[in-house]
Regions:
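Flexible glycan-contacting loops in extracellular carbohydrate-active proteins
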Residues: 186-214
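Short, aromatic/His-centered strand-loop micro-motif at the edge of beta-sheets
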Residues: 137-163
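Exposed low-complexity, polar/acidic, P/S/T/G-rich flexible segments that act as propeptides
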Residues: 210-224
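Short tryptophan-centered beta-strand motifs in secreted/extracellular beta-sheet-rich domains
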Residues: 68, 160-169, 173-177
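A generic beta-sheet turn/junction motif
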Residues: 74, 168-170, 206
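Low-complexity, Ser/Thr/Pro/Gly-rich disordered linker/stalk regions
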Residues: 1-82, 99, 154-156, 172, ...
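Secretory/extracellular carbohydrate-interaction modules
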Residues: 45-138
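Short strand-turn-strand beta-turns centered on an Asx-Gly dipeptide
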Residues: 176-184
């Protein structure tokens, strides 16, 4: 069931006049588009191997909505967004690279216990290396890559411009596409602290997957404690 969160305050924006706010690691390339956008391209790889990683440099707080537009140009892989990715001891994903285990851009670098990172991530436009759709769009929690939510993939079409809105309110996350609720989750596992603050990022992974990102906005939204009570009824 979708729960409405109003945008209270604009915290960050990027219209991609330059790429100064983005950190690239792994494979592939990122480059600016003349009309104002960021192109991410992973090629010559395979799922699980080195991906095209792009992380937004500002550290984002909890209780936020992230909005952007995306056009996927090829179906030889999938797109992942990371929310609140940081070290388990509070390390900054980018500034504290030297304090964290080295990363080459393989998938396990961002979920394995050995790398000491926590986050939520969501996959969409979810095709395999040969261009076959894999069935769903998944939410996972890291470390551990634990499945905590899933639903129908709302971004299957090539060359179509989609408007995405990701809402994070502590352990409650939602995905909206073109103004419509797609799916979300509530994370009831408090065995360790839930992912809270950190970086937002992209992972493109596959044999050939390219996407253009436009008009990134990050808003503060109000915490909603009633979510937990509604779901207990």
């Amino acid at each position: 069931m979708p729960i409405a969160y109003a945008n209270l305050e604009l915290l960050q924006r990027d219209d991609f006049a330059d790429a100064a706010q983005w950190h690239h690691e792994g494979a592939g390339e990122i480059k600016l588009l003349p009309e104002g956008g960021l192109r991410l391209h992973c090629f010559g790889s395979r799922q699980g191997a080195e991906g095209c990683m792009a992380f937004f440099r500002p550290t984002l707080p909890d209780h936020i909505a992230i909005e952007y537009d995306i056009i996927v140009h090829s179906h030889g892989g999938l797109v992942i967004n990371y929310l609140a990715i940081r070290g388990l001891q509070g390390e900054d994903l980018i500034a504290d690279l030297a304090k964290l285990p080295p990363r080459t851009g393989i998938m396990a670098d961002y979920y394995a216990n050995r790398t000491g990172l926590q986050s939520y991530h969501i996959s969409f436009s979810r095709f395999d290396d040969d261009g076959r759709h894999t069935g769903t769009s998944n939410w996972r929690r890291n470390p551990g890559c634990r499945l905590i939510g899933h639903g129908s993939d709302p971004c299957k079409e090539l060359k179509r411009r989609y408007s995405l809105r990701l809402v994070k309110d502590a352990g409650h996350c939602q995905l909206f596409v073109d103004g419509n609720f797609a799916h979300g989750f509530i994370d009831w596992d408090h065995a360790r602290p839930i992912p809270d603050t950190g970086k937002f990022g992209f992972r493109l992974i596959g044999s050939d997957v390219m996407a253009d990102v436009f008009a990134l906005r990050v808003y503060r939204v109000p915490p909603n404690m009633s979510v937990w009570h509604i779901c207990e009824e």
